[in-house]
Amino acid sequence: SDAIASLAGSWRGVDDARAHDLYREAFEVDPTDYYPLLNYVDGEIERTGSTGVLDILAPMASQAMARCRAHVDVGVNIPWSLSSLAKFHLLLGDPYAALEWYALAIRSANSPDAIPSLERTRAAATQIDGHGWCDRMLQMARIARFPEETATGEAGRTPTEGAPSIEGPVLIVAGSTDPRLAERIEGYRPLVAAAMAGFEGTVISGGTRQGVCGMVGEIAATGARARTIGYLPADLPANAEPDDRYDELRSTDGTGFSPLDPLQNWIDLIASGIDPSDVVVLGIGGGQIAATEYRIALALGARVGVVEGSGREASRLLADARWTDAPGLVPLPADPYTVRAFVANPPQSLGSVEREALARQLHEAYRGEIAATRSEDPAQRPWETLADDLKQSNLNQVDDIVGKLAEIGVDY
């Protein structure tokens, strides 16, 4: 089947009908070969504008998905095996799982061409649950991950109409809004307050009065320095109340709460020229939408701090072996001071020379305090030979000190 599928690929764009027939021939030879199977399904949907072919896909999908998953587990054909597994989940009616696998594919991509497109299935997009979510995410991710190699494509034309650009840095507060968990989530209010205390930039959340989103609105009303933006669907469920304490509420075109809300905030961020590395996410519990939000942020290169013990999707992410090695994922204790340090803005008015000079002084003071121990501890080395991560630790201490001074009005 590999040889036939390769031949089919050579006909793509030259004689698509010939390519389509060859893809069918290839998967008939080996029904477990996911590459020709998915290409045949894409071609049928593109040709007919309907999803009738999925009746054929469903019975044979399990073996092809098992082979695809086996490739993922041993790191074969990455990111294509990841995106193929995502496509199976999408076509078989599990869009939330599809989003998670697509996020892994986005994270693994080393070029814009390695991020898949759903162009061939758009003819039947309204017949495939969650197709719009996945399509929008992939278009946005291609630009966000590879801004210098991609033109401002369709994702660049879909920011919130008439909305001003978002100013960085950006803090996204995500997590539980389930009223049944209100009492438990209330215990995390000090963490949200600590995250927003002194934060200067833009804070984004869900824009309702429920759960962590409502905490953002309430804290904003007390005079927070940051500008707050809430994203919520135009067709808001009856049990959800918009929070007018936000500085701005932006509507998405979703029906009820969906991944379109966090996707739209990322589309707006990218359209505003915000680098994902300048975005910090604070995650507290949450359901399926939060699970998507955490993984999209990690895939794009944001820092995601997830509060340990907050349950549900936050806990599942921290236990997910596919994500635990993500550079941006940081497990956070339920401690306000740690959360504040995690989201803190680096002091902008302190020059790099002054910042390093203060860090050197802190390090020398530390060396002086422990000089009598004559330890071989690498942390006792002179600044010039100190490991980079230990230098960064001293620089972070400087940032924290300067930030605390700024909070009490001390001009540095």
Predicted regions and their residues:
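Acidic/glycine-enriched connector segments
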Residues: 1-39, 43-48, 54, 58, ...
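Canonical tetratricopeptide repeat
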Residues: 4, 37, 82, 115-116
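"A position-specific structural signal for the A-helix of alpha-solenoid helical repeats
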Residues: 6, 39, 84, 88-91, ...
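Alpha-helical repeat scaffolds
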Residues: 17-25, 51-71, 96-107, 133-145
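Terminal, low-structured helical/coil segments at or just beyond the last alpha-helical repeat
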Residues: 117-147
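Alpha-helical propensity feature that highlights long, continuous alpha-helices across diverse contexts
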Residues: 327-412
